[in-house]
Amino acid sequence: MTKQSADSNAKSGVTSEICHWASNLATDDIPSDVLERAKYLILDGIACAWVGARVPWSEKYVQATMSFEPPGACRVIGYGQKLGPVAAAMTNSAFIQATELDDYHSEAPLHSASIVLPAVFAASEVLAEQGKTISGIDVILAAIVGFESGPRIGKAIYGSDLLNNGWHCGAVYGAPAGALATGKLLGLTPDSMEDALGIACTQACGLMSAQYGGMVKRVQHGFAARNGLLGGLLAHGGYEAMKGVLERSYGGFLKMFTKGNGREPPYKEEEVVAGLGSFWHTFTIRIKLYACCGLVHGPVEAIENLQGRYPELLNRANLSNIRHVHVQLSTASNSHCGWIPEERPISSIAGQMSVAYILAVQLVDQQCLLSQFSEFDDNLERPEVWDLARKVTSSQSEEFDQDGNCLSAGRVRIEFNDGSSITESVEKPLGVKEPMPNERILHKYRTLAGSVTDESRVKEIEDLVLGLDRLTDISPLLELLNCPVKSPLV
């Protein structure tokens, strides 16, 4: 028997193993602190969806989508409208990713909530149309399946390697995470879960050139949510796909997305199932406090630390004394964000992906929030920001590549006209060295949600999500999320 035919007849492997785990996962298998943490990650995703729903690029996406998509049964967050499941999932995902404030994983970069929540919410409304009631614990279990599977599959292909090579990695290995989360919500058997995974994986894609302009980068995790949801729904209807899609030697997911990476071995399929049930990636999903790429949070925090230490030296009135800013980054961060904008005006997304521009706005405004990247009132044309951005250079430091949790590290050196300099290093920014406390996530939720809706609705959503494990029907939650919100930028 040839190797290829043996492979094609394989009945077990990591695909089968993770599908069995996902299909059979029960609340009794999950530590109570993991169940609790999942609720806060869901709350953070909801806050990001609300604050991202009415920014200009999200409104443009909704207008375009509504022009060709018919109404459906699935709610669009913040709009009071409904679409079909696939369209609703993509739209809601675009909202969560819209402001670069949503979660990320520091070892296998992806934005979990933007994949898992839109797919799971849409799948639940499909079942509701069929007369089935979805409980809060159903949603938590499905979310945890997504939170746990995405980083594992990403680590199997060396996490940020795809990003270094120009792929939008989260849009790639987010697809199987979306399929597993959807499959869990739909109650798929392990066999059908493999079908869902196969359908999702054969669609996986995303190009990182999207960071240089336009709007499409905002919805590329939506492609993963769409692919996962579509895979789950088709499998739920009996549609079949290839089995063993992750590990197949010919045309398999792990093999195809690691070709030419120069690694030995090219991929580590054991990572797909490493520590299942004992190590919980739900606690390694990082919460953002800055509205920019998570890989440069270390340098931003370093600048913030220097501003606290040298308030007079880095006072806005004295920034013209800066001669040069150099930042050392991990390979992934430098590949992704270590570029200087060449064209003006810069787009919002490009500003949020350029370490030069990001550090310049932190120096000028002493904060790095959504308002720093607003396209209103020539905000992205400010001369003082551009003057500093052109003084920023970056290089990669192999030191930061040794630990997967240091991918967002940074060492910043600021040189002044008089020849003096100051330096600060942050290897693991806030939320990476230790998980962000739940209380800090709640504060972020209240701040973001409170900027786009009234206090009573903020409290209602908070109570429903933090009591999700006791909620017998999630319809009231989805109905509240559907209520129109305002733009955070006006």
Curated annotation (Swiss-Prot):
It catalyses: cis-aconitate + H(+) = itaconate + CO2. Keywords: Lyase, Mitochondrion. The keyword Mitochondrion applies. One of its GO terms (molecular function) is aconitate decarboxylase activity. GO terms for cellular component: mitochondrion. InterPro entries: MmgE/PrpD_sf, MmgE/PrpD_sf_1, MmgE/PrpD_sf_2, MmgE_PrpD, MmgE_PrpD_C, MmgE_PrpD_N. Disulfide bonds: none annotated. It is found in: Mitochondrion. The keyword Mitochondrion applies. This is Cis-aconitate decarboxylase. It comes from Aspergillus terreus. The lineage of its organism: Eukaryota, Fungi, Dikarya, Ascomycota, Pezizomycotina. The gene is cad1.
